[in-house]
């Protein structure tokens, strides 16, 4: 799966495309195929190193707001169905083709 990732902190040059693992939902999570995301002040501050990275690690995928469609569900999910259109705010990860919430 493709995502925009941070390779350090700085200007726009630290943003690159990368192939990362396809997310798998836990029992109470859904996978969302991201159809739209946004750029906000927190994303800019994170890129510049002035905002804590929500999930430091091998791939830091920024992005907080998203909208899309549910493509997979955990075994205990009851409020959503595959195909439902959803939107939300996460602490990071919305600049990917899919995310788990």
Language-model-derived ranges and their functions:
Residues 21-38, 50-93:
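Glycine-rich beta-strand-centered segment in the early N-terminal region that forms part
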Residues 14-17, 93:
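Residues that act as N-cap/strand-start positions at coil-to-secondary-structure junctions
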Residues 93-101:
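Short, Lys/Arg- and Gly-enriched loop/turn segments at beta-strand edges
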Residues 41-48:
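Cytochrome P450 core scaffold surrounding the K-helix E-X-X-R motif
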Residues 6-14:
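Extracellular beta-rich ligand/substrate-recognition surface
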Residues 16-21, 100:
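Generic structural detector for well-ordered beta-strands
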């Amino acid at each position: 799966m493709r995502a925009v990732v941070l390779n350090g902190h700085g200007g726009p040059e630290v943003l690159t495309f990368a192939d990362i693992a396809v997310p798998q939902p836990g029992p109470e999570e859904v996978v969302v195929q991201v159809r739209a995301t946004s750029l906000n002040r927190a994303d800019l501050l994170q890129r510049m190193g002035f905002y804590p990275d929500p999930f430091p690690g091998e791939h830091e995928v920024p992005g907080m707001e998203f909208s899309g469609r549910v493509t997979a569900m955990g075994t205990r999910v009851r409020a959503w169905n595959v195909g439902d259109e959803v939107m939300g705010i996460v602490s990071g990860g919305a600049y990917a083709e899919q995310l788990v919430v």
